[in-house]
Amino acid sequence: MSEYKYCVGIMSGTSLDGIDVALCKIRGSGLDTDVKLIDCQTYPYPTNLLCDIKKSLDLSTSNAQLLCSLNFKLGIEYANAVKKLVAANNLNLKDIAFIASHGQTIYHQANNERGFIKSSLQLGDAATIAYECQTTVVSNFRAGDIAAGGDGAPLVPYVDYLLYRDKDKSRALHNIGGIANTTIIPKNANIDDIYAFDTGPGNMMINRSMEVLFNQDYDKGGDTAAAGIVIVDMLQELLDNPYLKQKPPKSTGRELFGINYTDKIIAKYKQNKPEDIVHTLTIFTAQSIVRAYKDFVFNKNKLDQIIFTGGGAYNKFLIKTISDLLDVEVLTFEDIGESSDAKEAIAFAVLGNETLNKSYNNIPSATGAKSRVILGQINFF
């Protein structure tokens, strides 16, 4: 097998909780991929940049000038994050073979409707990152899948298959970021056996309620939710969301479960205690995940374990609620000796490596694409 090379994966998700940057060593490709995490850090967005991102997400405050400028501001910020992590590990930028950057999702149009076609926009100019870091950058991963008729999401299942398949255990890898998504990997699977989809909201609605009601970024450990009780009418309204009944492959985003929707729910039930609203949103998130397994997975596959990753894996109340509702072993990434925070940044490093090796790196059964394609666009340096 080839020698290890240093690479960096960058992920900034819909939770807007910062820039996850993973410094890795990688060699091989495809089923022979061998990747080792050296270090991963999350760098918070500067306040003014976070403000610009939030403006760009709201149709009432977004505009072309803002998006144009933000694209390059994010490129500079991502490059600065890479420089910090590389220096902290006593390496030089010239040691880095490539960077793979997902970018900051601004809008994800999952369906053709009202004259709009399937599309997805991630900002964070790759040419700027390449110039600032003096290395090759792979970016814009979702476009290739959308061009092939897919949703452009979820993309991480390909990496889940490469790194976490098992000949004896059927498992699901479930990421709880802003949106929650699952990858189903039957035991002894080949790539055509894999399927994946977005189950619904992850941290998105919980985080927004904490911001509005408690002026906090998130519910640490789920402590606020644990102090509340269910608002029955509110929970039923949330569970009636049509997305939960939609069959996979499917994907969603803040367009459906973001600020506008969450704020309407909070306003409608504002006469209730704040902790009860957070509790109910957390129960809804848990039940949307559980329903996804009961409606779309268990009738096809008997799972031995579900492994949770992402920021939501640290919400103890959320994970316990899910575990109590499922008759299957529930683990977090930390339980298997890995980092929930680092998983998606590592995944995009692997996807970038596949791109540079000219390997197909989408899974049509997950995204709905007509065929397998090579994802990512390359800025050589």
Swiss-Prot record:
| Alphabetized Pfam families for the sequence | AnmK
Q: Which domain of life is it from?
A: Bacteria
**Which UniProt keywords are present, listed alphabetically?**
ATP-binding, Carbohydrate metabolism, Kinase, Nucleotide-binding, Transferase
Supply the InterPro entries for this chain.
Anhydro_N_Ac-Mur_kinase, ATPase_NBD
Example GO biological process? 1,6-anhydro-N-acetyl-beta-muramic acid catabolic process
| Coiled coil (residue ranges) | none
UniProt xrefs under CDD domains: ASKHA_NBD_ANMK
Q: Which pathway? A: Amino-sugar metabolism; 1,6-anhydro-N-acetylmuramate degradation; Cell wall biogenesis; peptidoglycan recycling
Q: Where does ATP bind?
A: 13-20
Name one molecular function that GO assigns to this entry. Answer: kinase activity
Q: What is its EC number?
A: 2.7.1.170
Query: Which reactions does this protein catalyse?
Result: 1,6-anhydro-N-acetyl-beta-muramate + ATP + H2O = N-acetyl-D-muramate 6-phosphate + ADP + H(+)
Q: Does the keyword Transcription regulation apply?
A: no
Functionally, this protein is described as follows: Catalyzes the specific phosphorylation of 1,6-anhydro-N-acetylmuramic acid (anhMurNAc) with the simultaneous cleavage of the 1,6-anhydro ring, generating MurNAc-6-P. Is required for the utilization of anhMurNAc either imported from the medium or derived from its own cell wall murein, and thus plays a role in cell wall recycling.
- Write out the similarity annotation: Belongs to the anhydro-N-acetylmuramic acid kinase family.
HAMAP family in the cross-refs: AnhMurNAc_kinase
Q: What is this protein called?
A: Anhydro-N-acetylmuramic acid kinase
What is the originating organism of this protein?
Francisella tularensis subsp. novicida (strain U112)
